[in-house]
């Protein structure tokens, strides 16, 4: 085993795997350090990838040649497009994955990277350089020293972590795995801004003890879409999920057990995720609801384990079983593993740059739950960004920043580093101002060439993208050039009103009655264009007037981005800013005026004062 690398990544979860792969794809000699080699790529909680907002992140990681979408397709036993009845901008691709197949897929994809080495061991502490006052490597628990130009911490829930099973509290980052205590103590000793968060997971059920006949069946989508642009068709047999609901009897059992809940006894102090609350929290906060949905999700093709999505809990196991057996279809259910909560340390992400580098320790990057986020997809996206930037730092290249106007990854990193978090951060489509441009179906168009310019994609991805772009541009040109009147549209089957105007087919797409079927009648050559390319070009045409309006907004954003704020050392020196604004701006360190405007509580008047001060300092 080598002991010197360009980049070391600590943690083999979704963030760590993407970080290691991203660094290795650029040619950096990379070490992926994990306590257990066999747990690399494990799905710790929900056996699913994607969802609203989250599916956009997965497609963006895939556009940059990441792993998560390809692994999801190799393991997908259930596909579902969420919000399918709404506009394309807010539709969310999601798959249910076979845990074993997903982990195997990640191992196979990592094995394809020649400059990546997996190191089995527990990270004990960082090596610090007295001269650069930065990070120079890692010390493992067994005493081995690994040197590197950059280190990525992707420790998930393992930093100083504690597991809660009812009132039973024990040290651990996941069931059966130790917490990272030494590393957590070192980070606290370095006086970094560290606090606690909490997450939880539901009990795992024995599917052989579920009465499936009593439940609402939810089949996989019939359409043939896949997550990765490189996956031509679905690869795995499909399974159905099922839906049931809690009821008043369930809620009575939960309320009777709250005195034994660590969440309500004060044993848990960390804040949990707003958008994935525990079932006891739901019952407590929404006591007037007559029930809450439970999605019963199979964990694999040959695995009887079922994940009951919607009942995350840290109640004692006997209460969990009593609660579940009040639910229709679960009257005789058996628990294979009880649900539990985990509390862990995280670093205030306002201490990070837009490249996810820790300002206080040059060469140290952070990704995933250590930055205060929740979810596989958020972790994978940060891992991609941190890995690209760690490799760039080790090679002496400038930071690489994802743009808020062109990616959900940019939205997330901007939110984290400017606003910080008070609860685990989850991606939502509502967080993106320019979401009409940031559709899941056009991630490759938005990001693959950009990632290629930073040396982050493979030759196979580049070839695929070049061919796809040629087809997309050719189709868009065809629709722009082909002119038709309403009579021709009506003859093609479109229920449009008869008028005397002649329009390009692109303009006709603004009429909801005109779709793919009508276009292929008027332009038969489009039949040979791949379905995903046709869908993207059609959506571009439908949104065209609104996209033009957003382009004007983005132009104003770019103007403000040209007013840099690096010259401002202390915002307290600017007259007219409140103490609260000064505190938030000093913590966030916005790079430009546009970023300062996104810091919570900063007013237009304050922005004017900041701009004047910055120009005076730069003069």
UniProtKB/Swiss-Prot annotation:
**Positions of disulphide bridges:** none
Matching entries from PROSITE patterns are given as: GIDA_1 (PS01280), GIDA_2 (PS01281)
Q: In the UniProt record, does the keyword tRNA processing occur?
A: yes
Q: Which SMART domains match?
A: GIDA_assoc_3
* Residues engaged in binding FAD: 11-16
Q: Where does the protein principally reside?
A: cytoplasm
Q: Which InterPro entries does the record associate with it?
A: FAD/NAD-bd_sf, GIDA_C_N, MnmG, MnmG-rel, MnmG-rel_CS, MnmG_C, MnmG_C_subdom, MnmG_C_subdom_sf
Alphabetically sorted, this entry's keywords are: Cytoplasm, FAD, Flavoprotein, NAD, tRNA processing
Name of the protein described by the UniProt record: tRNA uridine 5-carboxymethylaminomethyl modification enzyme MnmG
Q: What is the lineage of its organism?
A: Bacteria, Pseudomonadati, Pseudomonadota, Alphaproteobacteria, Sphingomonadales
